[in-house]
Amino acid sequence: MARVKRGVTSHAKHKKTLKAAKGFYGRRKNTIRAAKAAVDRSKQFAYRDRKVNKRNFRALWIQRINAAVREFGLTYGRFIDGLNKAGIEVDRKVLSDMAIHEPAAFGALVEASKKALAYLKEAGTANEFESAVR
């Protein structure tokens, strides 16, 4: 059986690792051992931060919605509660975008939310409200 030398594959692996380490500072960009450790760590950070990114964007959307809704005299929580009671299903990303780019449409949603909250307050139950809306 022929002897298998793995120079080609290890060279390819090293080349791939060093390419991924391009732009790193110091030994991390040219020494394979340091580069491998740095690349592995960077992949862990990338994996973690893809999850964190989603949290950060949701928090940003909520802050924007809260700021826009307070101009109409509501808080974020009451606004979302009113939307749910009115049966309006719009996600936070779209609400945030509407608040910035389409203030008139966003204002209509705020008024619908206020109307739902006021009607429920005087009617008392959600079932009566849903039958009145339909």
UniProtKB/Swiss-Prot annotation:
| Coiled-coil intervals, chain numbering | none
- Alphabetical list of InterPro entries matching this protein: Ribosomal_bL20, RIBOSOMAL_L20_CS, Ribosomal_protein_bL20_C
Annotated GO biological process:
ribosomal large subunit assembly; translation
Q: Which is one Gene Ontology cellular component term of this protein? A: ribonucleoprotein complex
Keyword list (alphabetical) reads: Ribonucleoprotein, Ribosomal protein, RNA-binding, rRNA-binding
Output the Gene3D superfamilies linked to this UniProt entry: 6.10.160.10, Ribosomal protein L20
A GO molecular function term, named singly, is: structural constituent of ribosome
Q: What is this protein called?
A: Large ribosomal subunit protein bL20
Gene source species = Rhizobium meliloti (strain 1021) (Ensifer meliloti)
Q: What is the lineage of its organism?
A: Bacteria, Pseudomonadati, Pseudomonadota, Alphaproteobacteria, Hyphomicrobiales
